[in-house]
């Protein structure tokens, strides 16, 4: 009687189907389908920093002083690498999506640190106070992604005048470069022109040897006009007399009485 009533109730329930086991025991089966949780939801979410809009306030907070004190954020960081020689470059990035790598860099491990050109106190920790050179990534231990952000933020802070940097002082020179360098100065005159000699030595008059003169006399006997001394171009010029004076000095001209 009880079994018949149970069978009637099972027929009326759509989600429950009767199943008779091997030993005559009825087993109730009911399919319960639940949605599997997505893989991304299983990972812990990255906490949102309260200092995202104003990152410079975190460096003045008591929490920062208790954690870092007066030392830079990368002072106590030690890189985790294989072997005794560290790689030349740090990892590309520490956070990929919601996955955080083991032993993250000094900036990625603290979610309240934000690289911003207005966060001057943080940027000063990655710049040498004596030379103004930005520390290399293997020296500070930051990943290459954060190192690129730091370099861009430091340059932007310098452009806005928030971060001081060294400008080399160059003393002005009171020298006239038009006369100090040989390539731009006036060309000095040739030594031969200063002494009055001609530019080429064969332009100056030289008395030929006597042996050569005797040979020419024998060769051009009766047709050679004897000359001695420099050529006529270098001989002193005789002043020319006026035509009136020349006519008065003629022998047949009458002379005026005194």
UniProtKB/Swiss-Prot annotation:
Residue segments, region Disordered: 223-258
Annotated organelle transit peptide span: 1-35
Pfam family, one: Ribosomal_S18
The protein, known as: Small ribosomal subunit protein mS40
Cell location: Mitochondrion
List of residues that carry Phosphoserine: 49
Keywords: Mitochondrion, Phosphoprotein, Ribonucleoprotein, Ribosomal protein, Transit peptide
Major subcellular location class: mitochondrion
Gene3D superfamilies documented for this protein: Ribosomal protein S18
Family, similarity comment: Belongs to the bacterial ribosomal protein bS18 family. Mitochondrion-specific ribosomal protein mS40 subfamily.
Species whose genome carries this gene: Sus scrofa
GO biological process: mitochondrial translation
Assembly behavior: Component of the mitochondrial ribosome small subunit (28S) which comprises a 12S rRNA and about 30 distinct proteins.
């Amino acid at each position: 009687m009880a079994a018949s009533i149970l069978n009637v109730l099972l027929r009326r329930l759509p989600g429950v189907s009767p199943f008779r086991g091997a030993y005559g025991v009825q087993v109730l089966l009911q399919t319960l389908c639940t949605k599997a949780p997505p893989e991304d939801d299983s990972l812990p979410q990255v906490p949102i920093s309260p200092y995202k809009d104003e990152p410079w306030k975190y460096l003045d907070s008591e929490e920062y002083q208790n954690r870092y004190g007066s030392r830079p954020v990368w002072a106590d960081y030690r890189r985790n690498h294989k072997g005794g020689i560290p790689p030349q470059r740090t990892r590309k990035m520490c956070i990929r999506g919601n996955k955080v790598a083991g032993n993250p860099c000094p900036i990625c491990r603290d979610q309240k640190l934000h690289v911003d050109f207005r966060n001057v106190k943080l940027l000063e920790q990655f710049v040498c106070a004596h030379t103004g050179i930005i520390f290399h990534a293997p020296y500070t231990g930051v990943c290459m992604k954060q190192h690129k952000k730091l370099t861009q933020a430091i340059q932007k802070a310098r452009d806005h005048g928030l971060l001081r940097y060294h400008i080399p002082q160059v003393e002005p020179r009171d020298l006239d470069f038009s006369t100090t360098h040989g390539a731009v100065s006036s060309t000095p005159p040739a030594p031969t022109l200063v002494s009055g000699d001609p530019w080429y030595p064969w332009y100056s008059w030289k008395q030929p040897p006597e042996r050569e003169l005797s040979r020419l006399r024998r060769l051009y006997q009766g047709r050679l006009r004897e000359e001695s001394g420099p050529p006529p171009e270098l001989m002193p010029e005789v002043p020319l007399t006026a035509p009136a004076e020349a006519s008065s000095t003629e022998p047949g001209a009458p002379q005026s009485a005194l």
